[in-house]
């Protein structure tokens, strides 16, 4: 009887202590643009690249200063792609802290500063410890540095927060 009560108590405690996955904040002036952006992320995660590209572009037609859509969006025109990234960088300080960090991670990567990227990914996790996305980003940066054991731990933490994190599961499978 005591074992059953202990087991039930443990289940109740673990159910009550479940961490809610908090998405990284995204700033846009328009709800429809946000919906296109979210749709683009789903398309890209499923390998539907043309649909993802179109959804990012739809978001940018509605809100041309949408930082994350500018950071992640692309076209077949490299000049336009550069303009997207420049717009993201120019507007990063008007966006959320998470968006600023993500843009700075991209900038550091473009400049070949992998240590800075890792430092920024750790900052993202410190500021957003309940976000599976933050742990996936950290895992990606650790993997980039060939620190595979730590990257696996980061992906596992993302899965602990969100057992349905496609990006974390996909990264672990690589």
Describe these PLM feature segments.
Residues 58-61, 90-93, 125-126, 156-161:
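Conserved structural position within tetratricopeptide repeats
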Residues 30-31, 64, 93-96, 129-130, ...:
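Short coil turns that delineate tetratricopeptide repeat
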């Amino acid at each position: 009887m005591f074992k059953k009560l202990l087991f039930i108590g443990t289940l109740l405690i673990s159910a009550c202590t479940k961490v809610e996955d908090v998405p990284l904040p995204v700033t846009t002036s328009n709800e429809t643009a946000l919906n296109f952006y979210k749709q683009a992320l789903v398309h890209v995660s499923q390998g539907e690249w043309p649909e993802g590209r179109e959804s990012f572009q739809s978001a940018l037609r509605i809100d041309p200063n949408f930082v994350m859509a500018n950071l992640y969006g692309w076209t077949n025109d490299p000049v336009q792609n550069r303009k997207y990234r420049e717009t993201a960088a120019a507007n990063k300080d008007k966006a959320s802290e998470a968006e600023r960090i993500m843009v700075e991670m991209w900038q550091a990567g473009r400049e070949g500063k992998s240590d800075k990227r890792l430092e920024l990914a750790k900052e993202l996790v410190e500021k957003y410890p309940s976000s599976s996305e933050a742990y996936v980003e950290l895992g990606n940066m650790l993997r980039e540095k060939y620190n595979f054991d730590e990257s696996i731990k980061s992906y596992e933490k993302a899965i602990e927060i969100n057992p349905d994190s496609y990006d974390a599961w996909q990264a672990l499978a690589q």
